[in-house]
Amino acid sequence: MAYGYSYASCPSVIIPAVGINIDAKDICGALRIDNNRLWSRTPDRGDVVVFRHPVSGRDYIKRLTGLPGDRVQMKDGVLHINDVAVGLVDGGVFEELKASQGPLRATPRCENAPVGTGGICNKSRQIETLPNGVAHGILNIGSQQMDNTPVFTVPPAHFFFMGDNRDNSTDSRRRQQEGGVGFVPFENLIGRADLIVFSSAGRSMLFFWTWRSDRFFKSVE
């Protein structure tokens, strides 16, 4: 584990059919003391991180954009860290099919809307460069509410996360009380995501016709 071990490193075991609901805190609760982690190191800005939501307990995967003490703000769709805008250059157009995806059957939102089911959904792609030099692609579909935010000051031992699909992401830009992610404590980090082993657009992994083989065993950028 890139960041050591905490209670969040343990799995939750949920089998509704037989009444089993064992939370990770029940298995590794002894590690949940004062943000403690075993054999830990500090995450780097730009890491793609799997973490446990502080309220719902669900696993999320987002990019770490704010470290403890950072001031993070969005202005007109541009990320600002400690009052300085990050680097941003054009990265072309991202295309995908307008179709239901994943277990929740979510349909992508398109910059070229309206797009019918089965049509090509376009999103603007940009390359964002963070203060430490990490460059990665982000997607935008136009002016959105979260393109302008107040200043978020990251508390000690907490982190600020954002999705690369900026206009279709539930992340730290929205407070936990509003259904967002908010600030995530260090103890809730599970690990760094380095490799996509498997990808599917279907409701179940068994629906082989929805597998996205072009994404199998690809490095996470």
Task: Locate each region found by the language model.
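Soluble "head" domains of membrane/secretory-pathway proteins
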Residues: 1-221
